[in-house]
């Protein structure tokens, strides 16, 4: 079993990296709920068959931070501006915690080289896939909307390529055959943030491996930090970040609730651009989950970096630095297709930094993963039914849309989106009111209610929609 640990670990890392990246980066709830169900099932089966290793100090801290961040994300339902979104966002963080848990349980049976190899393999496959798509759509990739296929977001695909390039430093020389594919795709995505992340990663690698150059490299790093604000001067991201800071100031304790930045942006924006994300994991977490949420996030990111340095794994440390820099200027935390590979690396570094541990107790691990698997099954069932309802609505099958939405409500009674689909399918003001009762700050629900109302109810609904989204063009 121990001999199979390395290849099995690499296979899981490869499959999740490639699978999530190919599924539009894992951005949608259906994608990450499905991944959570699969990974939790793998963890449960692994514990039952082969047991696992207890986490050392670094690994326990990482897992604790991710578990608490998951709980805090879900708990923000209690005070959120849009409570249903907290329960939609929480499974994504749970996926991150379970992925890290799988690597930690595998312990020293899976070396960092196997993990790095799996991530690089998955990244290379997706990069090659994208290059084929770009060749097929030569000269019209951007116009046809396939520039970042299958990942779906150019900056996310570019960061995945950058992480793959950095992790090649941990692999034997023959693995460098992947470098041209990764580098070419990184260049074609034209992502300034990913290039900055790659530069930061190489600087970190140099600082850890070239003692004589540390002063020079430190000076270069400092110059980059000083220049960063000027690089983003006048950029739309600056507006997102200011909105996030204003959101944080308005909710200084617990934040406004997971997934609510989109509401805040629509109310505050001065330009007719829409976004669901603040394009900075640190500012968005502070705005939505408050100082405690940010502290848990920073712990989850900083502890593995410290572990990689302690374990003398410069390539792993460099990859983690690259992700941390990239996530500062984009919404990569919401993209499991790039965050899950990072967490494979993070957990491997934590395992490497501690001495071998005693076997984990099955009496603790089996019930824990059984509960997570059951919760994942419920989340996936609700997301799948809702996705089916939305698909049916798009093709004009109102009866099936309403039926699937009601089925979604049986496992996710908190879903305002499901009631919204019922309202769309049946033209039902009652359904829209049920949705609004669950999420009063979704401007689109008020607008849709106005479209099926008359007289004073219509006027009041339009007024509320305009308050929540002043720059909307109207019904």
Question: Which residues make up each language-model segment?
Answer:
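Alpha-helical transmembrane segments of multi-pass inner-membrane proteins
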Residues: 7-24, 36-47, 66, 70-77, ...
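A juxtamembrane structural motif centered on a specific transmembrane helix
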Residues: 2-3, 311, 345-381
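Hydrophobic alpha-helical transmembrane segments in integral membrane proteins
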Residues: 228-239, 361-400
């Amino acid at each position: 079993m121990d001999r199979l640990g390395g290849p099995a670990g690499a296979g899981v890392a490869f499959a999740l990296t490639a699978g999530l990246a190919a599924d539009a980066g894992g951005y949608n709830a259906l994608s990450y709920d499905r991944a959570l169900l699969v990974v939790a099932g793998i963890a449960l089966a692994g514990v039952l068959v082969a047991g696992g290793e207890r986490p050392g100090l670094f690994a326990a801290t990482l897992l604790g931070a991710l578990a608490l961040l998951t709980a805090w994300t879900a708990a923000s339902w209690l005070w959120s501006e849009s409570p249903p979104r907290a329960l939609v966002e929480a499974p994504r963080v749970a996926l991150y915690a379970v992925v890290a848990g799988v690597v930690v349980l595998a312990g020293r049976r899976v070396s960092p080289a196997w993990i790095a190899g799996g991530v690089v393999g998955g990244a290379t496959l997706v990069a090659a896939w994208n290059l084929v798509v770009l060749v097929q759509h030569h000269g019209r990739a951007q116009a046809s909307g396939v520039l970042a296929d299958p990942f779906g977001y150019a900056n996310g695909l570019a960061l995945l390529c950058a992480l793959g390039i950095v992790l090649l430093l941990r692999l034997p020389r023959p693995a460098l055959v992947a470098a041209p594919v990764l580098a070419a795709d990184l260049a074609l995505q034209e992502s300034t943030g990913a290039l900055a992340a790659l530069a930061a990663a190489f600087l970190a690698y140099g600082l850890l491996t070239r003692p004589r150059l540390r002063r020079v490299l430190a000076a270069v790093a400092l110059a980059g930090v000083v220049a960063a604000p000027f690089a983003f001067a006048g950029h739309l991201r600056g507006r997102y970040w200011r909105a996030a800071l204003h959101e944080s100031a308005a909710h200084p304790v617990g934040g406004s609730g997971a997934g609510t930045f989109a509401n805040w942006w629509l109310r505050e924006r001065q330009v007719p651009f829409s976004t669901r994300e603040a394009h900075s994991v640190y500012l968005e977490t502070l705005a939505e989950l408050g100082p405690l949420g940010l502290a848990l996030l920073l712990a989850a990111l900083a502890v593995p970096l410290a572990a990689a340095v302690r374990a003398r794994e410069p390539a792993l440390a460099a990859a983690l630095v690259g992700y941390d820099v990239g996530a500062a200027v984009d919404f990569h935390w919401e993209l499991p297709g790039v965050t899950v590979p990072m967490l494979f690396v993070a957990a491997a570094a934590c395992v490497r930094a501690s001495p071998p541990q005693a076997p984990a107790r099955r009496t603790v691990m089996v019930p824990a993963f059984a509960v997570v698997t059951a919760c994942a099954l419920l989340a996936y069932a609700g997301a799948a039914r809702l996705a089916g309802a939305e698909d049916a609505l798009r093709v004009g099958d109102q009866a099936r849309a309403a039926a699937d939405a009601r089925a979604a409500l049986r496992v996710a009674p908190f879903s305002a989106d499901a009631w919204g689909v019922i309202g769309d399918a049946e033209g039902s003001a009652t359904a829209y009111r049920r949705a609004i009762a669950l999420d009063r700050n979704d401007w689109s629900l008020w607008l849709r209610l106005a479209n099926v109302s008359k007289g004073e109810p219509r006027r009041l609904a339009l007024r509320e929609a305009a308050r929540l989204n002043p720059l909307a063009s109207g019904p």
